């Protein structure tokens, strides 16, 4: 219920931004200026790219969704899948914009019905993500959405989940790409699209 309420608020917020803020998707928008960098968080040496400041800017958020939709509309997507948790934010707004079903990819133990799961590596140990078994149909062309591409481990696991259910990964999209972490190499067989790169700055 909490997730449903959150997604409703996100979509309503997007509706408001769409109505009140004209945003030409062809216009170049400097997203870097809307993303805060927090040094040494969550541990020393890490430059954390904080998208909460982007989300507080309705024009920037609207621009992101327009760019994603413009890129993927010609690709005959049938479903949008958002990765917990920030992928839900962009995935919900994009699903609304493209008039497509939204599928949630969640951490282990968060989905109530029958699921399939996929393990992926962490810095120390492993974790799992899950998807409802009935969320993807054979042949579905699925666009997977997350906020940021780092090492690519979570997105790779999400792609595996879609493929376990005989879906087709039609694309993987992100707001932020961190090229120095080489996530694109792990996902090179897929169509990748991101809006802004942070290369160690």
Which ranges hold each PLM region?
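Short, amphipathic alpha-helical "lid/cap" segments that border enzyme active or binding sites
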Residues: 3-8, 65-69
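Short, glycine/charge-rich flexible loops or terminal/linker lids adjacent to PRPP-binding catalytic cores
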Residues: 103-143
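Short Gly/Thr/Asp-enriched flexible loops that form oxyanion-binding sites at enzyme active sites
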Residues: 89-98, 159
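Short glycine-rich phosphate-binding loop at a beta-alpha junction
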Residues: 77-84
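Conserved G/P- and acidic residue-centered "switch" motifs that form tight phosphate/ATP-binding loops
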Residues: 147, 152
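PRPP-dependent phosphoribosyltransferase catalytic core
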Residues: 7-34, 156-201
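Short, hinge-like loop/turn segments at secondary-structure boundaries
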Residues: 98-99, 119-123, 187-191
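Active-site-facing substrate-recognition patch
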Residues: 20-77
